[in-house]
Amino acid sequence: MEDIHHKHTQSVSRSDMLRLLAVSRGDQPADLIIDNVFLLDLINGGTLPGPILISGDSIAGVGPAYAGTAALERIDAGGAIAVPGFIDAHLHIESSMMTPIAFESVTLPLGVTTIVCDPHEIVNVMGEKGLTWFLRCAEGAQQNQFIQISSCVPALAGTDINGAEFPLTAMLPYREHPHVLGLAEMMNFPGVIAGDEPTLDKLDAFRHLTLDGHSPMLSGKALNAYLAAGVENCHETLALEEGREKLALGMALMIREGSAARNLDTLAPLISEFNSPQCMLCTDDRNPWEIAHEGHIDALIRRLIQRHHIAPHVAYRVASWSAARHFGLKRLGLIAPGKKADIVLLDNLEQVAIRQVFAGGKAIDAQQLLRSAAMRQLASCPPQHNTLRRAPLSAEDLTLPLTQDADYRAIQLIPNELITPARTVRWLGDGFDTPDVCRIAVMERYGQQRVPALGLLHNSGLSKGALAATVSHDSHNIVVIGHHPAEMALAVNQLIDDGGGLCVVADGQVVVHLPLPIAGLMSSRSAAEIADIIDALKQACRNCGMTLNEPFIQMAFLSLPVIPSLKLTSLGLYDVDHFRFTEVRIPEESA
């Protein structure tokens, strides 16, 4: 069985090694020398003088000893500071609504030279076809695109209808792929803790690689048991003390700042010189509008330094070297001899002002990357068949019967959080006793034509209209919220016509919609085009009274039955805390 040293980026051929050594000794000219540059020392702090010598895709040497060394090409960095390329330790590319190729075209120029992706969104929809397409894209990328093999497809068996299953027998052949680093987030933490044998079989099969975790709010004996099984990290940490306990027990923290789940400000005080090797940065779910307006990993580094006063060498350490060490990627994460020449040149450390990005020793031309994206995307042969097999719906299909003076369970939405507590509301005949309650419905889209699951949502801010989407974790059925079933049906039927996507309806009309024809998750449009439509969608949501930063991303997590506490799947209202379905209406004897 191959180990991590045979993975992408981790080996150098003998001929390349001999050439690298000759350049290091000064016997042959470097392919490229970056002059007039300073290196941020991630190990000791401070900066070191250049130059940086590059041979092939590797760093041959650094420092004043190489002043005046011959090179085939020289670049004057103008006094810039060089830092290692950034690593996003956990994300779902599908959540950007871009293809892997379009994603690379906008994040690589922002210094993100390496990503570790879990493709469980597309695998839930179309199984291995989606995974093999992602791997094809990774093989042709300049960005180091690593894939974790999705561990929970479906997210939690028996709680939802999804488009595919991905059992261990199907997972095993992918372990040896050079772009696969391990097992993706093990969301079935109850199964791990209970010693469920099929779940433990998955951990055992990938134990020689990395075992990613998913353990929101897990503590005490349960957390100890989860870690004892071999799980190594978590990106779902929500509270400071929760993070402190996980670090103390040896768990690595992936500190997340996505478009909806924003945990960096809460967890940043944990980061210190001592524990920073156990802390990484990730985005999890971030859309192209946020990437265009705020940035990607660069935005997280900027916030750590400027808002939380983290020392620059520590901030850049958690953005690169920490993740490289965690995943066993020995040739990534530092600017040092023998490392892969993934380098970001900065005009300003605190502002993360990027001058130039190098991937494997090659300067990245952002415009050329964008221009070539469409052709490269076509060559990757993305799956094109329609995955939305649902007959149109009527207002009657989406009408939840309500009884006067009866109590109902509502899902409570919390801005910028994925947890959704249960809230009791009472129907008074002409409205609820609690303000800001709307209807929610989830319906499977894989051809079974099941009756929609109906429920109530509190604290969305929606005052009129309806929102619908086929981005709905993790099974990606159709989710819709609104006040009037007729408008909800209009939004859903628009998505059926589009083959999937996002839609806003107001005043009885479709205001704006974004078709997502690739698995109902992604568009073949450019990042800029998607960002413009997302901008229009966000404005339409604001016009409907919503103040959430990312209404569609928050809505996408209302169906995920592995994050507490109350969710609505295509099979009904699910109590995550007690692992069971429950009724929307609360019986009188228990009210």
UniProtKB/Swiss-Prot annotation:
CDD domains: AdeC
Natural source organism: Edwardsiella ictaluri (strain 93-146)
Assembly description: Homodimer.
Highest taxon, organism lineage: Bacteria
GO MF term list: adenine deaminase activity
UniProt family annotation: Belongs to the metallo-dependent hydrolases superfamily. Adenine deaminase family.
PANTHER family: ADENINE DEAMINASE, N-ACETYLGLUCOSAMINE-6-PHOSPHATE DEACETYLASE
Reactions this protein catalyses: adenine + H2O + H(+) = hypoxanthine + NH4(+)
Enzyme class (EC, first level): hydrolase
Pfam families in alphabetical order: Adenine_deam_C, Amidohydro_1
Record protein name field: Adenine deaminase
GO biological process, one term: adenine catabolic process
Swiss-Prot/TrEMBL cofactor(s): Mn(2+)
Keywords: Hydrolase, Manganese
EC number(s) stated in the UniProt entry for this protein: 3.5.4.2
Lineage: Bacteria, Pseudomonadati, Pseudomonadota, Gammaproteobacteria, Enterobacterales
